[in-house]
Amino acid sequence: RVGRDGQPAGCAYPTTKFAVNGLTLSLARELAGKGIRVNAVAPGVTHTDMVDALPDEVIKPLIATIPLGRMGEPEDIANGVVFLASDMASYISGVVLPIDGLART
């Protein structure tokens, strides 16, 4: 969501998300004629060592904002990447795939 709507404080984070969106679409258009697809993933809160180090008072409110009711697992992100790299996605290019439990961070 921040990469689409921005946020009022701290412009660096949404700026990098906007950059990934723009770069993905621009490269996809630039390379389409060569048969090269360009896509990206936008992972939400994912169960990692970094997240495990956060206190419960930080994690619980984050999970409460995720409509699917849980944080992602690394395998969730990997599955999206494998799909985008597969022949099943051969007609998909210029997409930033949110893998975020509908949180749209």
Located regions from the model:
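Catalytic tyrosine of NAD(P)H-dependent dehydrogenase/reductases that use a Tyr as the general acid/base
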Residues: 13, 21
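Active-site helix of classical SDR
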Residues: 16, 24
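A short C-terminal helix-loop "cap" of Rossmann-like NAD(P)-dependent dehydrogenase/epimerase domains
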Residues: 52-66
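A conserved structural motif in NAD(P)-dependent oxidoreductases
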Residues: 66-77, 88
